[in-house]
A protein has these predicted regions:
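Short, conserved, surface-exposed binding loops centered on an aromatic residue
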Residues: 160, 193-196
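Short, flexible coil/linker segments at domain boundaries that flank nucleotide/cofactor-interacting
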Residues: 28, 196-198
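Short hydrophobic beta-strand segments
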Residues: 34-37, 200-206
Length: 208
């Protein structure tokens, strides 16, 4: 029998909760950070952001193509725009805008897909985003980041703020086990980490 490893911090949060809290703290110190949402303040955990920094959030409504277009326009003027929307809709409805207005234009929009994968559960297949990796990996000039835990999420958001390139961040809804016990390991795009060493089998995974 294999050994069951319990590695869940009692204070573990959903990665998208950590994303929103980190973005709020960074935005307090940087007025160029702007959150753009598609009627997703609640699901994107941006209610506190809107209440605290009402001049740094733009509500588009349920219009994902317009969401990305507005974020692209803001980014082109020097704003650090985070376009926040459920991953299932952001990466399907707004694909043309992501491709042309963001990636191919080398426009540093921070695309944020929330409730990714099957996070929406009972809402059904219309709300599941099993396609976003495949779709976005086919687009040149777009970095894709799916943090594994709260530590990586916080570091990824800080990196995204300071990266002047198009980027896609992918977050789920469930509290995540803490896989990073030593913050000194740092965070780097494209660099994997060994969680546990063994000799019987190799398991390679990403994200949540």
């Amino acid at each position: 029998m294999g050994e069951v490893i319990q590695n869940i911090n009692e204070n573990a949060k959903a990665n998208q909760d950590v994303f929103a809290a980190t973005l709020l703290e960074l935005a307090k110190a940087d007025k160029n950070i702007v959150a753009v949402t598609s009627d997703s303040r609640g699901s994107g955990k941006l209610v506190a952001f809107g209440q605290t920094l009402p001049k740094q959030i733009v509500e588009i409504g349920i219009a994902e193509q317009n969401l990305v277009g507005v974020a692209a326009g803001l980014a082109s003027t020097g704003k650090k725009a985070f376009a926040v929307s459920p991953a299932c809709f952001l990466t399907a409805r707004a694909l043309e805008q992501i491709k042309n207005d963001v990636a191919y234009s080398d426009n540093p929009v921070r695309l944020v897909g929330i409730s990714a994968g099957v996070s929406y559960g009972a809402l059904g297949t219309t709300h599941h985003s099993l396609h976003d990796y495949a779709v976005l990996r086919a687009i040149n000039n777009l970095s894709i980041i799916a943090p594994a835990d709260n530590f990586e999420t916080k570091e990824a958001v800080k990196l995204a703020v300071n990266q002047d390139k198009p980027i896609y961040l992918r977050f789920g809804k469930k509290p995540m086990p803490l896989l990073t016990e030593d913050p000194q390991v740092g965070f780097e795009i494209g660099k994997g980490r060994v969680i546990r060493k063994g000799a019987d089998v190799a398991i390679i995974a990403n994200g949540e």
